[in-house]
Amino acid sequence: MKRALISVSDKNGIVPFAEKLVELGVEIISTGGTKAAFEQAGVPVTGIEEVTEFPEMLDGRVKTLHPAIHGGLLARRDTAEHMEAIAAHNIKPIDLVIVNLYPFQETIQKPGVTLEEAIENIDIGGPSMLRSAAKNYAAVTVVVDTADYDAVLTELQEHGATTFETRQRLAAKVFRHTAAYDALIAEYLTNITGETFPEKVTFTYNRKQVLRYGENPHQDAAFYTEPGTIENSISAAKQLHGKELSYNNIRDADAALKIASEFTEPVAVAVKHMNPCGVGVGENIEEAYLKAYEADETSIFGGIVALNKEVDAKTAEHMSKIFLEIVIAPSFSEEAFAILAKKKNIRLLTVPFAGNMEGFEKTSVNGGLLIQANDSLVEDTTSYEVVTEKQPTDSEMKALLAQWKIVKHVKSNAIVVGSDKQTLGIGAGQMNRIGSALIALEQAGEKAKGAVLASDAFFPMDDTVEAAAKSGITAIIQPGGSIKDKESIAMADKYGISMVLTHVRHFKH
């Protein structure tokens, strides 16, 4: 290895790396700020303009886009015609390229960033050099990740060159890196144009964790996160205690966070298998947790609990009495953390809560991808319609609105029975609506008397209303829209139940 081209925005570790290369007899070629850093550190360096015999121009936009650079990168060492061609133009082969790119992601995440600032942080020369070097990985070693410095240096020190396998691995990483970089730029500019569903989409994710296994032990899995921090998301969670999250933990935690984010008042959400098993609302977080626990004392065991306020010592004492997989909250008091951390198998996570979740959700299907807006519509309750003779009382309306927030997060067909403070029965995932209703009503038992019922979609028949009435339900909220709405309304009137139509459906598959 005779010649290395180094141009980096992240200068961590680059000076000692270059010093080792010089000790191995490698000539260093560099640009701009990287060259200045080498000169300041006393590392011998050749400026890029000495190689190209052309000055940097356009405020640094054009530095390395030159045949003297790309010829030295792309020439096949095993092809005589290539080597003769670059020799004829006094172009020397470049054997090692170390480049990382302008910080586009960090730039667009800055508050108040302008379009001009974003544009100026779109790297052109860097990706071009990386791609040229990666294409010719048979001869050229290319490094885009500072984490690879030590491994490359070790091979050079021990063997005088890198192995083919190493170069191939590094080239693959480069193409992943440049593809992700371009995808981020494309997404940023597409969002500016307001185009929701462009003809092509490319998403970039960063691997956060290789998981022990997936949904089942025979399935391999990993967890990838979107670039940047998305508040009130599991990808933004910080783990304070416990072993690594599993695939199922992550999915359940995501479901719990989505429900907890619906509420501004203190709420506790218990989830099992991506469905809520208990949701409690209170004047404080202790009361909210106790309501969630009372909602289903059996199912909460081994569950995931998300709370939207700091966990205090009293709440932690209650939680410590049962086995919980995960507790997620904005924060834990010192006393609460000390209490819960005594339990070896519990995982404690903090997540920044910032209101409702917006954006888009993606679902894979064989051979494709479905993309839709998150079900985060802020509904205009003034458009809700009371269609029965009986009007809901203020307390009933408060309970209806609370359960309406919850039912949209339950797998369809979804029925939730509850009060303004807690769920009392949840029927999820049945293939017919009456089936889900009967499950929810049976779970609620005697507590259904005086409670309300929420349905994620319309009633195809009046049987759910009749079952609710016979269990003591006093008010129902549902979207409406069935050809048999009149029959359901008539059944409600027959039993003196109030019914509110929202005209918004909340299927969840």
Swiss-Prot record:
Residues 1-144 form the MGS-like domain. InterPro entries: AICAR_Tfase_dup_dom_sf (IPR024051), Cytidine_deaminase-like (IPR016193), MGS-like_dom (IPR011607), MGS-like_dom_sf (IPR036914), PurH-like (IPR002695). Pathway: Purine metabolism; IMP biosynthesis via de novo pathway; 5-formamido-1-(5-phospho-D-ribosyl)imidazole-4-carboxamide from 5-amino-1-(5-phospho-D-ribosyl)imidazole-4-carboxamide (10-formyl THF route): step 1/1; Purine metabolism; IMP biosynthesis via de novo pathway; IMP from 5-formamido-1-(5-phospho-D-ribosyl)imidazole-4-carboxamide: step 1/1. Pfam families: AICARFT_IMPCHas (PF01808), MGS (PF02142). CDD domains: IMPCH. One of its GO terms (cellular component) is cytosol. One of its GO terms (biological process) is 'de novo' IMP biosynthetic process. The keyword DNA damage does not apply. GO terms for molecular function: IMP cyclohydrolase activity; phosphoribosylaminoimidazolecarboxamide formyltransferase activity. The IMP cyclohydrolase activity resides in the N-terminal region. Belongs to the PurH family. PANTHER family: BIFUNCTIONAL PURINE BIOSYNTHESIS PROTEIN ATIC, BIFUNCTIONAL PURINE BIOSYNTHESIS PROTEIN PURH. This is Bifunctional purine biosynthesis protein PurH. It comes from Listeria monocytogenes serovar 1/2a (strain ATCC BAA-679 / EGD-e).
